[in-house]
Structure formats: C-alpha cells, structure tokens
Amino acid sequence: MQEYLNFLKYIKENGVLKGDRTGTGTRSIFGYQMRFDLQKGFPLVTTKKIHIPSVVHELLWFLSGSTNIKYLNDNNVRIWNEWATVDGELGPIYGKQWRDFNGQGIDQIADVIQMLKTNPNSRRILVSAWNPCVVPSEKISPQENVVKGNSALPPCHAMFQFYVANNKLSCMLTQRSADAFLGVPFNIASYSLLTNMVAQQCNLDVGEFIWSGGDCHIYNNHIEQVNEQLSREPLALPTLKILRKPNSIFDYKYEDFEFENYNHHPAIKAKISV
C-alpha cells in the first residue's frame, strides 16, 4: 500500500506543529485523499501487522447498534476501553447513530441497503455518524459525557457514501480527524470490509474505496514509529474471501471472513493518545 506510505510521508514533510485535545501535540495537514481499487486486493497495510480480529469485531459491533464494550472485550478486543464507563458504556456513538439516529428509529444501514437495491443511482445513499445533539464537551472526561447522555468521543469517521456504476459498488469515507499512524490503517480496512459486505448483500461487484481526511495528523510521540514504517517495502495485498451470504447485513459472523495471503512486516507498537 504505497498510497498509505505516501500519505505518511506527506504529513511528515508538510505538516504544521499543532496542539491538540490530548496534550500530546501533532504534525498536521488539512485535506488528503486516497483511492483503493478493491478489485486489486484488500487494502490492509503490510508495512506493519494489523490486528484483523479488532477490525472485524469492531465493525460487527457497530452494525449491531451496540454502544457497550462487552462484546468487544468478550472477543479480546480492547480498543475502546480507555473511554468507557465502569459499566462499559460509551454513549450514543457509531452503532447508535448508524442504527437508531438520534434515538428516533432511523436505521441508516437498513435504509442504505434498501436504496442500493431499489434506486442505486440515488445521490443520497449515505450514513452519518455525526450528530451535533450528542457531541461531547471537551471540558469534561469521556465518562462524564456519557453520564450526561453524550457520546464518549465524537465520531472521527463521520460520514460515508455509496456509489454504483457499471454494477460496481464504491464507498467514500469522510474522516474529520485522522490519526495517521494508529487509526487510518484500521479505518481503511474497516470500511473496505463494509463495502465488500454491502456489495454482497446487494448483488454488486466491488469498485473503489475512497478515503478522505480532514485534519490528518501524526502525533509527536509516533514520529519514530512512522520513520520505521517508511523504511519498509510494501508487500502484495491479501485477498478477502466472504465464506457465506447471510440473510442480512446484520447477520455476519467473524468466521465468515478469510484474509488470504496476508503477509506483513512486524507490528510497530505506539501509545494511543487519550
């Protein structure tokens, strides 16, 4: 995935130093886009190991509409633990907005599937996780925000839109805040997987996944890791195989997915900024 390495290099060479909510500090640019042809392999970063179970389980968790980390923890995925309450609650984050926007019964995922099947030329086939009514305050902790009825964190990947041409399904993600080293490889994999799942449900082939970032940043304590990753040569992309077609987008299981020939360089550890 040379596209991703080019992204890291661009931020490193052109980013401006900025403060941020976490106090860590970043090197930041505004506005960047990457395109991945899903016919040419699954865009899983190979210059470091990506933890596939976390990608898959988190996406299934979003699709379930859950906002409690119990399912994730039961499957040894702990990527949300720092922001949850003692009861495991995260407030009305992604799953809630996808499946029951603003608590008003609007199932955006079901609506998208229906529109793709009945009106694939529509320019309104999109899902928004950004709900101003529940954006948390930066003046109090994530846990305190949850108690007040807000989300623990505002959505970083805020909106995604589907597009059909020549019987191929493409998806474009708009990400307002992009942690280039830790988050973006994960987001690319997650939404590419979702695109494959939606395409299967709608009897479409896959087209492109397009990633569009707003504030794209490398945290100051990730520079050494970024340099290590940039020194590595990308390997051939793996292939995604979906082993069955369930009755609904909501019925997939972890075991339904195989990532064939995922060859990768060793993992690179880095601290997440909370």
UniProtKB/Swiss-Prot annotation:
Its main location: cytoplasm. Pathway: Pyrimidine metabolism; dTTP biosynthesis. Pfam families: Thymidylat_synt (PF00303). DUMP binds at residues 21, 123-124, 176-179, 187, 217-219. It is an enzyme of class 2 (transferase). InterPro entries: Thymidate_synth/dCMP_Mease, Thymidate_synth/dCMP_Mease_dom, Thymidate_synth/dCMP_Mease_sf, Thymidylate_synthase. Homodimer. This is Thymidylate synthase. It comes from Francisella tularensis subsp. tularensis (strain SCHU S4 / Schu 4).
